[in-house]
Amino acid sequence: MFDSFYPKNNNHLMIGPWLILVLILNLNLPICAEERASSDWWSLQQVKRPEVPEVQNKKWVRNPIDNFVLAKLEEEGLVPAPEADPRSLTRRLYFDLIGLPPEPDSLPEIEKLLASPHYGERWARHWLDVARYGESNGFEYDQLRPNAWAYRDWVIDALNQDMPYDRFARLQIAGDVIEPNDPGAITATGFLVCGAFDGLKPSGDKQRKIMRQDEMEDLVGTVSQTFLGLTVHCARCHDHKFDP
């Protein structure tokens, strides 16, 4: 067994990690989690409307959400912060919606900010992070992707057009099947392939199959994390200790 693990290039720095792996396998260490996750996992439960808590300062409340905020503040012996002045509110709106500071003496114009193309540019960044978007392949060669911008711009336009989330999700998962004659729907499926990609050509059939499985793991894992909030990467080799 040891011979198959021993580094062939006589790099002694590699021996340590292999020894640790062999010891773990031989010791048959138990899983440290006390209970295995199942269908009773908290994030898989049906959404229920919670009971709105009672508060003392009822005049401060404007909507049910305020009840929850104020109830926690009162529980900790705290009082709400004073209402922000118009200048502060304007700065918050600008930075939150478009990520840019307001001009001097600007007044809050919410509809104008939501209609600004900068709104989609700012918030698309967060979705592109979830989608593991990159404009190069990564790995050691890190080749540029000259057409990666098309998916990026589709996300920006979708946000600026206030596309419903269900359509936003469906097109990215199967736009080429749902609307095969719509170039935009096909562009949306860039979500599936916009992650890191090893540009090395496989040296044989075995390596080709391994690389294909790596690609499928990345695709399935990204879809599940993005739209289900669950990690399924581990299912490639074993049951997950924590997620169902």
Locate the predicted segments by residue.
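Charged, low-complexity surface segments at secondary-structure and domain boundaries
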Residues: 1-3, 20-21, 107, 153-155
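N-terminal secretory signal peptides that target proteins for export/translocation
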Residues: 1-15
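Short non-domain terminal segments
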Residues: 2-3, 27, 42, 189
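Intrinsically disordered, low-complexity regions enriched in Ser/Pro/Gly/Gln/His and often acidic
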Residues: 9-11, 25, 34-35, 120
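Bacterial N-terminal signal peptides
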Residues: 15-30
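Short, structured secondary-structure elements
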Residues: 35-244
